Amino acid sequence: NMGHKNKETDKKNLKLTDLSSVGEFGFIEHIKKNVKKYNESTIVGIGDDSAVIKNSNLYSLISTDMLVEGVHFDLSYFPLKHLGYKAVVSNISDICAMNGICKQITVSIAVSNRFKLETLNELYEGINLACKRYKVDLVGGDTTSSQKGLIISVTAMGVVDNKKICQRSGAKNNDLIIVSGKLGLAYLGLQVLEREKQVFLVNPNSKPDLEPYKELVERQLKPEARTDLINFLEKNSIVPTSMIDISDGLSSEIIHICNSSGMGCILYSDKIYKDQSLLKVCDEFNLDPISVIMSGGEDYEI
């Protein structure tokens, strides 16, 4: 549980630390204190010019994502702890999509001077929590200033057995298309949060009741990567012909696979699983469930 208690009263009594007073290297040292190592393959982590990672007959997998405030997230309803967690998870998900296991990440941030050291601590709490949950080592990154807002860039490094790698280009004739879980919930969670924000702007005294939308909001604020699926495939000696993670919605992802594989595909709308809460909230927001599933995105299913 990543409960976000109201700390406003505490904050008034605490003197917060300006980032300029610790400096970039002081900040790196501060972050380094809470970073633990989980993998033997990590030879050198944070604090050198480059991380050093040992590999054998495995392929290295490397993936990068960038999140920009005002484009990818809105801090008025997105707690920094959750943001840090989600930034890591979305990258681990890319490694899963190659049938690999994520081992290391680097995190780079650009911050404006409105962020204090204590607020960035919350971001790194979420990052460290995801590292612990998925047994991933944070091995480096960069920090710099930005004119306004927060930018986070995460690079994930993983490994895959060279005989078990799954690319987008492997789909074959008569392959069955399978999705690892529910789709569309994260998008609906975002709609709920956006609606509550608009209500709050009109009436700052209103208290949002998110309880009925708990699962949807959690899917948006704290998604998980399907490492369990990769373990399942390994345990059962299954190597799919092709895989992709659903970050942008089912339709664009399946088109990526089709284009890379030189294939077409048929999707049956009656065979696509529609969660009860999805149907209920689609009705409430006057949205078409299939459109939400096809174009919603950020589900991080495979």
Task: Annotate each PLM feature.
Residues 2-302:
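Helix-biased detector of long, well-ordered alpha-helical tracts
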